[in-house]
Amino acid sequence: MRAIETTVPLPLDEAAAVVRAALAENGFGVLTEIDVAATLKAKLDVDRPALKILGACNPGFAHQALQLDPNAALLLPCNVVLEPAPDGGTRVSAVDPRALMPEPEFAELAESAAAKLTAALDTASHGTTGS
């Protein structure tokens, strides 16, 4: 799956705070946070490495997408995944909106959303935000 990816030079919990701030600077709010490792431990008693999913939404982009096609709700919110990076720090990835919305009527919107997600992850990759 085509993704926008970066590494944040911080442990996962600290990286999550930096990613949240970087998303906010780029117009995204975090609507949900799922601790996948904790959920799987609680429900299935299995251990796995840390994995968090932030459900991020840019209201303007969401509104535009829904105006173009109500089924765009199936793609909301945008998942931003955080997991320990093999070489240290935290790997952060999001599905590239251009891959999710290949239809011509979504091209401009998908490009704008990808640019904002890329900017957010680029900011987060420095381990700090502009705030």
Language model regions located:
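Terminal, regulation- and interaction-focused segments at domain boundaries
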Residues: 1-26, 126, 131
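Short, intrinsically disordered, mixed-charge
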Residues: 21-25, 71, 119
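Residues at alpha-helix termini
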Residues: 25, 42-43, 123
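Compact, glycine-rich, soluble single-domain proteins
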Residues: 29-31, 35-81
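Beta-strand/loop substructures that line and gate deep hydrophobic ligand-binding cavities in soluble
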Residues: 79-103
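Well-ordered alpha/beta subsegment
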Residues: 97, 101-131
